[in-house]
């Protein structure tokens, strides 16, 4: 704990007696959708199928290609394609679609995902992280994207763990990039709800958030202060010109709060 931030670390010894040796286990069928280079020098992003039956794997491969191309079309990934590999893993489910508790619909799927996380209809996650990693056995993997075979809007991004998003909703492309920003980059949400301030306790206004793209101005110098033009006021007023030009500034509203977070 440095006073400004805290970090937790846990050392894993590969020789630990309680770690099962799975080097002889066969890897699931998989395909490189984008190969930037050698696995030892690249970040390997594995894309898993969730809620796709064996007969729907071809559809999954098409969806995974869409996700890969969309992510790599945005900076900073666009300029660093040679540092990433994207690998689609054919992980079939017994049932098609995913579990929807609010409809009392429970399905047997590869990682057991479900909507209604934290009782939010759109929040789609899975607590079966062990299942995800079992599916990647003997496949290079530093990060996970899970595509859900449903047209219902939803998803979630868990920092340093996985992105999970629905593949057949019209907003699939922007949502998979958004959730990847959470899971891979640790970015906070840059939006808020007009009706109410949700999750008021999620961010203390007396401290600087750990997410790199939101601030309470407590320690803004540690964030993107060096990217703001000296002629731009802080906080920054929203204008049509700034919106059109994507002017870097400090705009109020973020982390689900309309006031106090920028």
Predicted segments, located by residue:
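Catalytic Zn2+-binding segment of zinc metalloproteases
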Residues: 180-196
């Amino acid at each position: 704990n440095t006073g400004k931030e805290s970090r937790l670390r846990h050392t894993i010894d590969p020789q630990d007696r309680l770690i099962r040796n799975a080097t002889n286990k066969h890897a699931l069928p998989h395909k490189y959708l984008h190969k930037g280079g050698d696995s030892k020098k690249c970040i390997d992003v594995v894309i898993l199928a969730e809620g796709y039956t064996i007969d729907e794997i071809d559809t999954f491969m098409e969806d995974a290609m869409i996700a890969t191309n969309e992510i790599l079309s945005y900076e900073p990934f666009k300029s660093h394609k040679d540092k990433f590999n994207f690998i689609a893993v054919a992980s079939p489910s017994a049932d098609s679609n995913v579990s929807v508790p609010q409809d009392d619909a429970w399905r047997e799927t590869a990682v057991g995902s479900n909507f209604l996380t934290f009782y939010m209809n759109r929040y789609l996650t899975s607590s079966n992280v062990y299942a995800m990693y079992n599916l990647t056995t003997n496949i290079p993997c530093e990060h996970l994207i899970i595509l859900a075979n449903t047209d219902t809007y939803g998803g979630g991004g868990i920092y340093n763990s996985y992105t999970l998003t629905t593949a057949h909703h019209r907003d699939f492309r922007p949502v998979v990039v958004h959730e990847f920003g959470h899971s891979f980059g640790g970015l906070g949400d840059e939006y808020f709800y007009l009706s109410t301030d949700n999750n008021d306790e999620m961010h203390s206004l007396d401290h600087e958030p750990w997410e790199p793209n939101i601030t309470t101005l407590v320690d803004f110098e540690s964030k993107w202060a060096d990217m703001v033009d000296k002629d731009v006021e802080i906080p920054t007023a929203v204008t049509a010109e700034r919106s059109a030009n994507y002017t870097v500034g400090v705009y109020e509203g973020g982390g689900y709060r309309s006031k106090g977070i920028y």
